[in-house]
Protein backbone atom coordinates (compact mmCIF):
# COMPACT_ATOMS: atom_id res chain seq x y z
CA UNK A 1 0.00 0.00 0.00
CA UNK A 2 1.14 3.54 -0.77
CA UNK A 3 2.37 5.55 2.23
CA UNK A 4 3.47 9.21 1.98
CA UNK A 5 5.71 8.76 5.02
CA UNK A 6 7.66 5.84 3.60
CA UNK A 7 9.68 4.87 0.53
CA UNK A 8 7.33 3.28 -2.00
CA UNK A 9 8.05 0.82 -4.78
CA UNK A 10 7.60 1.92 -8.39
CA UNK A 11 4.60 -0.38 -8.70
CA UNK A 12 2.91 1.12 -5.59
CA UNK A 13 3.58 4.61 -6.94
CA UNK A 14 2.03 3.74 -10.32
CA UNK A 15 -0.98 2.18 -8.56
CA UNK A 16 -1.47 5.38 -6.54
CA UNK A 17 -1.21 7.48 -9.72
CA UNK A 18 -4.15 5.63 -11.24
CA UNK A 19 -6.50 8.06 -9.49
CA UNK A 20 -5.38 10.58 -12.18
CA UNK A 21 -5.91 10.56 -15.93
CA UNK A 22 -2.43 9.52 -17.01
CA UNK A 23 -0.54 10.03 -20.24
CA UNK A 24 2.36 7.89 -21.33
CA UNK A 25 5.41 9.74 -22.63
CA UNK A 26 7.35 6.71 -23.81
CA UNK A 27 9.84 4.38 -22.16
CA UNK A 28 12.91 4.94 -20.02
CA UNK A 29 16.22 3.41 -21.08
CA UNK A 30 15.32 0.59 -18.66
CA UNK A 31 12.09 -0.12 -20.54
CA UNK A 32 9.80 1.35 -17.86
CA UNK A 33 6.76 3.44 -18.76
CA UNK A 34 7.14 7.19 -18.25
CA UNK A 35 3.78 8.30 -16.89
CA UNK A 36 2.60 11.87 -16.40
CA UNK A 37 -0.46 13.96 -15.63
CA UNK A 38 -1.37 17.63 -15.90
CA UNK A 39 -2.15 19.31 -12.59
CA UNK A 40 -4.16 22.28 -13.80
CA UNK A 41 -5.64 23.31 -10.46
CA UNK A 42 -2.47 24.66 -8.84
CA UNK A 43 -3.21 28.05 -7.26
CA UNK A 44 -1.50 30.93 -9.02
CA UNK A 45 0.17 32.42 -5.90
CA UNK A 46 -1.37 35.83 -6.59
CA UNK A 47 -0.39 36.98 -3.08
CA UNK A 48 3.29 37.30 -4.11
CA UNK A 49 2.71 40.77 -5.57
CA UNK A 50 -0.51 42.57 -4.70
CA UNK A 51 0.23 45.39 -7.20
CA UNK A 52 -0.08 43.12 -10.24
CA UNK A 53 -3.43 42.38 -11.85
CA UNK A 54 -3.50 39.20 -13.91
CA UNK A 55 -5.42 39.67 -17.16
CA UNK A 56 -7.01 36.95 -19.19
CA UNK A 57 -5.11 35.99 -22.33
CA UNK A 58 -6.56 37.80 -25.30
CA UNK A 59 -7.41 35.06 -27.79
CA UNK A 60 -11.02 34.86 -29.04
CA UNK A 61 -12.97 31.83 -27.83
CA UNK A 62 -14.61 29.85 -30.62
CA UNK A 63 -18.39 29.85 -30.48
CA UNK A 64 -18.56 32.87 -28.15
CA UNK A 65 -18.60 36.65 -28.48
CA UNK A 66 -16.43 36.83 -25.35
CA UNK A 67 -12.63 36.98 -25.40
CA UNK A 68 -10.05 35.55 -23.06
CA UNK A 69 -8.96 32.63 -20.93
CA UNK A 70 -7.53 32.85 -17.41
CA UNK A 71 -4.98 30.04 -17.36
CA UNK A 72 -5.25 29.61 -13.57
CA UNK A 73 -9.03 29.46 -13.21
CA UNK A 74 -11.80 26.99 -13.95
CA UNK A 75 -15.13 28.67 -14.78
CA UNK A 76 -17.06 27.10 -17.66
CA UNK A 77 -18.60 30.45 -18.67
CA UNK A 78 -16.59 32.03 -21.56
CA UNK A 79 -17.71 35.52 -20.48
CA UNK A 80 -16.51 35.09 -16.89
CA UNK A 81 -13.25 36.67 -15.65
CA UNK A 82 -12.37 33.21 -14.38
CA UNK A 83 -13.07 31.26 -17.59
CA UNK A 84 -10.50 28.47 -17.72
CA UNK A 85 -10.81 27.54 -21.40
CA UNK A 86 -12.63 24.89 -23.38
CA UNK A 87 -10.73 22.05 -21.68
CA UNK A 88 -7.53 21.06 -19.86
CA UNK A 89 -4.44 22.66 -21.46
CA UNK A 90 -6.60 24.21 -24.22
CA UNK A 91 -4.42 27.34 -24.25
CA UNK A 92 -0.97 27.01 -25.79
CA UNK A 93 0.61 28.84 -22.85
CA UNK A 94 -0.24 25.99 -20.48
CA UNK A 95 1.88 23.69 -22.60
CA UNK A 96 4.91 25.94 -22.18
CA UNK A 97 4.52 27.08 -18.56
CA UNK A 98 6.59 24.24 -17.08
CA UNK A 99 9.90 26.03 -17.67
CA UNK A 100 11.95 28.79 -16.03
CA UNK A 101 12.70 30.79 -19.21
CA UNK A 102 12.18 34.40 -20.17
CA UNK A 103 10.79 34.85 -23.67
CA UNK A 104 10.00 37.97 -25.61
CA UNK A 105 8.50 38.56 -29.03
CA UNK A 106 11.96 38.56 -30.65
CA UNK A 107 13.00 35.09 -29.49
CA UNK A 108 13.50 32.80 -32.44
CA UNK A 109 15.36 30.11 -30.53
CA UNK A 110 15.88 29.02 -26.95
CA UNK A 111 18.30 31.28 -25.13
CA UNK A 112 19.61 31.33 -21.57
CA UNK A 113 20.98 34.44 -19.90
CA UNK A 114 24.08 34.01 -17.72
CA UNK A 115 23.87 35.05 -14.06
CA UNK A 116 24.63 38.71 -13.51
CA UNK A 117 23.20 39.93 -16.83
CA UNK A 118 20.66 42.72 -17.03
CA UNK A 119 17.83 40.39 -18.05
CA UNK A 120 18.63 37.89 -15.30
CA UNK A 121 18.81 40.64 -12.67
CA UNK A 122 15.62 42.27 -13.91
CA UNK A 123 13.68 39.03 -13.71
CA UNK A 124 14.98 38.08 -10.28
CA UNK A 125 16.78 40.36 -7.86
CA UNK A 126 15.99 43.83 -9.26
CA UNK A 127 12.28 43.10 -9.62
CA UNK A 128 12.09 41.96 -6.00
CA UNK A 129 10.34 38.82 -7.14
CA UNK A 130 10.03 35.81 -4.90
CA UNK A 131 11.05 32.54 -6.51
CA UNK A 132 8.13 30.17 -6.16
CA UNK A 133 8.01 26.53 -7.22
CA UNK A 134 4.83 24.64 -6.40
CA UNK A 135 4.94 20.86 -6.94
CA UNK A 136 3.78 19.30 -3.71
CA UNK A 137 3.92 15.59 -4.55
CA UNK A 138 6.13 13.44 -2.35
UniProtKB/Swiss-Prot annotation:
Domain Peptidase M14 per the UniProt entry, residue ranges: 1-138
Entry keyword set: Carboxypeptidase, Disulfide bond, Hydrolase, Metal-binding, Metalloprotease, Protease, Secreted, Zinc
Cited SUPFAM superfamilies: Zn-dependent exopeptidases
Disulfide bonds: 66-79
InterPro entries (UniProt xref): Peptidase_M14 (IPR000834)
pH dependence: Optimum pH is 7.0-7.5 with AAFP as substrate.
Molecular functions per Gene Ontology: carboxypeptidase activity; metallocarboxypeptidase activity; metallopeptidase activity; zinc ion binding
Keyword Transport: no
Tissue specificity comment: Detected in the body but not in the tentacle crown (at protein level).
A biological process term (GO) from this entry: proteolysis
Cited Pfam families: Peptidase_M14
Superkingdom of this protein's organism: Eukaryota
Annotated protein name in UniProt: Carboxypeptidase
Organism taxonomic ancestry: Eukaryota, Metazoa, Spiralia, Lophotrochozoa, Annelida
Amino acid sequence: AFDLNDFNTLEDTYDQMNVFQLSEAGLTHEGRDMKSWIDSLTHCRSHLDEDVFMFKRNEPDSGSACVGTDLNRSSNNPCSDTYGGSGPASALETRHSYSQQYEDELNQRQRYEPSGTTVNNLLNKDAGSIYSYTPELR
